[in-house]
Design a protein with these regions (language model features):
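Aromatic/acidic polysaccharide-binding cleft in carbohydrate-active enzymes
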Residues: 2-37
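Solvent-exposed beta-hairpin/edge-strand motifs
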Residues: 110-124
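Hydrophobic alpha-helix feature that most strongly marks membrane-spanning transmembrane helices
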Residues: 2, 6, 21, 47, ...
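Aromatic- and carboxylate-lined catalytic core of secreted/periplasmic carbohydrate-active enzymes
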Residues: 30-67, 71
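C-terminal beta-strand-rich structural cap/linker in extracellular carbohydrate-active enzymes
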Residues: 129-149
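Carbohydrate-binding surface patches
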Residues: 64-113
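Active-site proximal loops enriched in glycine and acidic residues that flank catalytic Cys/His/Asp
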Residues: 12-14, 20, 34, 75, ...
């Protein structure tokens, strides 16, 4: 949600851990004072990450599927311009989401990420290209965003 083009849209209560129900009872009430604090902190961190990296707001966008379990979003500003042709710092961000319950390893080429040789994830992991490729391990039902350095 925070890596794709457009304004992030969060369904009522997702940030607090509210679970849905079947129609017509689509949503439970908001748990005022009982929010899932870990979930709330994660949403706040994702919003701060997007606000701190303009490429996540206005960079060119491409979708990838490096394996059947993983969906990826690549956002790039190249040649000093963003997707709208406005002046922007060159940057590249990659978000990978593992839809599988098991850990997977995916491979990205340096060309996928604007020729970068190093990627730094939102949680501080550092990935270095070896022979022009990155090997990225993603835990089951998890995601990560990495920035080219």
């Amino acid at each position: 949600v925070f890596s794709v083009p457009g304004m992030p849209c969060i369904y009522y209560g997702d940030e607090a851990g509210v679970e849905g129900c079947a129609d017509p009872f689509c949503r439970r009430t908001y748990p005022w004072g009982r929010e899932d604090q870990d979930m709330l902190a994660r949403y706040k961190a994702m919003a701060a990450m997007r606000n701190g990296h303009p490429v996540l707001k206005t960079g060119e966008c491409a979708y990838i599927a490096p394996c059947s379990a993983v969906l990826g979003v690549i956002r790039k500003n190249e040649n000093g311009k963003d997707a709208f042709g406005k002046k922007a710092e060159n940057a590249c961000a990659v978000t990978l989401i593992n839809r599988s319950a098991r850990e997977v390893v995916v491979y990205l080429t340096s060309a996928d990420v604007s020729g970068a040789q190093t990627l730094v994830s939102d949680d501080g992991q550092i990935f270095t290209a070896r022979s022009g490729a990155f090997s990225v391990k993603i835990k089951g039902l998890q995601g990560m965003t990495m920035f080219a350095k």
